[in-house]
């Protein structure tokens, strides 16, 4: 399991993810997986939570949609969600994505939804609720922090609480 958190703050966006891969609920298989990546000529970043194979499959499909729609993040996300809803094989995938560009944060969920946040913060995964609460508070009360600093701090807070999230955090910030 893992935690991914994305933040839009002071005109920048950032996404952070930890590196823990868990087998079932008892064994940590790996602590340094990279679940946050830049794609589309480094103009978009994506983070995933859920089954690793499922998430990688969805990430590849999203990247194909992004190329098909010339980097239009919202259109690519909506098209992936429509495909996800309509394909019985995809419906069985257990993963979620957060995708960001310099202006937008979106969740693409397993039920085929595209979610835009009201408050500039999104989080998914086992520690998502903790990370989201921390990022909302930091965004509200720490105006001098960057989006990347907020996302990383939120992940560290989640890792202190959630046993399925670790402190091996990767941050990608887009300007």
Swiss-Prot record:
Na(+) binds at residues 159, 162, 165. One of its GO terms (molecular function) is metal ion binding. GO terms for cellular component: HslUV protease complex; proteasome core complex. Allosterically activated by HslU binding. It is found in: Cytoplasm. Keywords: Allosteric enzyme, Cytoplasm, Hydrolase, Metal-binding, Protease, Sodium, Threonine protease. It comes from the Bacteria. Its EC number is 3.4.25.2. The active site is at residue 2. Pfam families: Proteasome (PF00227). InterPro entries: ATP-dep_Prtase_HsIV_su, Ntn_hydrolases_N, Proteasome_sua/b, Proteasome_suB-type. Its main location: cytoplasm. GO terms for biological process: proteolysis involved in protein catabolic process. It catalyses: ATP-dependent cleavage of peptide bonds with broad specificity. Belongs to the peptidase T1B family. HslV subfamily. Protease subunit of a proteasome-like degradation complex believed to be a general protein degrading machinery. A double ring-shaped homohexamer of HslV is capped on each side by a ring-shaped HslU homohexamer. The assembly of the HslU/HslV complex is dependent on binding of ATP. This is ATP-dependent protease subunit HslV. It comes from Ligilactobacillus salivarius (strain UCC118) (Lactobacillus salivarius). The lineage of its organism: Bacteria, Bacillati, Bacillota, Bacilli, Lactobacillales.
């Amino acid at each position: 399991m893992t935690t991914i958190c994305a933040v839009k703050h002071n005109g920048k966006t950032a996404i952070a993810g930890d590196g823990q891969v868990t087998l079932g609920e008892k064994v940590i298989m790996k602590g340094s997986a990279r679940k946050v990546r830049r794609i589309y000529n480094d103009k978009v970043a994506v983070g995933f939570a859920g089954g690793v194979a499922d998430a990688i499959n969805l990430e590849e499909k999203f990247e194909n949609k992004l190329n098909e729609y010339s980097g239009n993040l919202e259109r690519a996300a909506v098209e992936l969600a429509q495909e996800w809803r309509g394909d019985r094989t995809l419906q069985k995938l257990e993963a979620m994505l957060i995708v960001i560009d310099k202006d937008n944060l979106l969740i693409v969920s397993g039920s085929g939804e595209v979610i835009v946040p009201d408050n500039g913060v999104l989080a998914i995964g086992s520690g998502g609720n903790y990370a989201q609460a921390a990022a909302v508070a930091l965004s509200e009360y720490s105006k001098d922090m960057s989006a990347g600093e907020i996302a990383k701090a939120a992940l560290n807070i989640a890792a202190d609480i959630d046993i399925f999230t670790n402190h091996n955090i990767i941050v990608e910030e887009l300007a």
